[in-house]
Amino acid sequence: MLNGQLKPDYNIQVGTENNFVIGYDVFPNPTDTRTFIPHLENVQKRLGCKFKFAIADAGYGSEENYDYLEENEITGIVKYTTYEKETKRTFKKKTFNSENWKYDAEQKEYTCPCGNPVPYRKTVTKKNKSGYLQTYEVYQCENCEGCPFRELCTKSEYGRVIQRNGHWLEQKAKVKELLSSEEYKTLMKKRSTECETVFGQTKGNLGFRRFHLRGKEKVGIEWGLLMPGYDFRQLIRLMNT
């Protein structure tokens, strides 16, 4: 930037298998979520194969990405952003978190901690930047006026409003069930020693901390020259053990 600040312009995505880089992509997207599907498709296309498993960290967990994995029969070992928080005992003790409230699916109604009904009001659909549609059911309590716990429950002048995405809740439940397996827990732990090592080695040992070329294509070429070297170093390390 002209003011001397350095800000990230490209998001590098790396796919690994047994500590070897098997594919990479360069994206202008600042967040990882929307790079997941195109990166996965690109790597599979280049290798001419279809993956049975896809392992990624919580930055990639989204409704759209989970749908893609399920539709393509890929077992996704992917946490979502609030996974760690939701799987702690303290989360269940959060009285005013609507996910801990009683919900009557038949009546389409929540019951708040004070026993007041929070009925269904309407359904809204939102489109994200990639064009994916998310559907929410809106619930609103009409008895918040005078409630002694209102300040703890909501800051809205209209009372407590809940946006329920039933599909997302189902997906999160599946992720929790999947990651309760020791087999998948082990695979998830392995991920951190694979992809993170690529960036750690590149920055720490090779001293590569910024690109010298400009433009997505040239940045891809520069990163592409680094990755075979990384894999070659891995091969030498294995041969010497």
Language-model regions, residue ranges each:
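Anion-binding and metal-coordination hotspots
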Residues: M1-T241
